[in-house]
């Protein structure tokens, strides 16, 4: 993604065998739903750390990374990697975490994704009441696909581990998705006393948090770096910073959600807008970050978009012309 390179640390290969073993257990007929180009090289690994303290200017490469075609069209969040560990300065991925990930979103019909070169992950849109198993927070591109199609019904049945909303277990108070440094939680709870007002449901609280974070600073691709002596990136951004981009806003939202007792995580991927049936070139300009939060009534994770609408123009893909 087109965020400062020094902010990311590449994933180790500690879980490669586990990922490969899991994928090999899926019936071979999944391949019928995927068009592939055979390759012998190994995709580069996605980062498993996001170092927030070093964030500075965000670059926007015009290089195309994938082509996306949606049958129905609309705004697509293409989910890549989620991060659950937060220590005030860094987001990290649980290397050995395996879970059923409930995908809840819009119906885009069939979505075709063709990558330019290999990608370490399969970038996937959100669908209503869909789930898949994630290892280490992502769907690893073990087969090195550079072209794949997600059918109208959503993910192929063989990738669907569960697809029934409302059956997930309640949040665990020891969940990594609620974990925060003690000092961070205490300061965040002070802010929440004014933010939440009369909100009672999970969705109402999330909406109020999103409104607050979006209004906390302006959108700018060249914000000031966090100053020396600061101990928490999210709180520095909310209390002192004047500007930031999606990484800043998504981090602040995820931290406030956790402090409010709502399981949350930081997610990176791409945000693109497509016209029905029209291929669109996606560049690193479309790289994006957002927060996900767990809604226990649905038994699913929902997107919380906390970045101001100023960034919308920066997320427009380039339609192909004939």
Q: Which residues are covered by each model-predicted region?
A:
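Helix-boundary/low-complexity linker signature
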Residues: 1-322
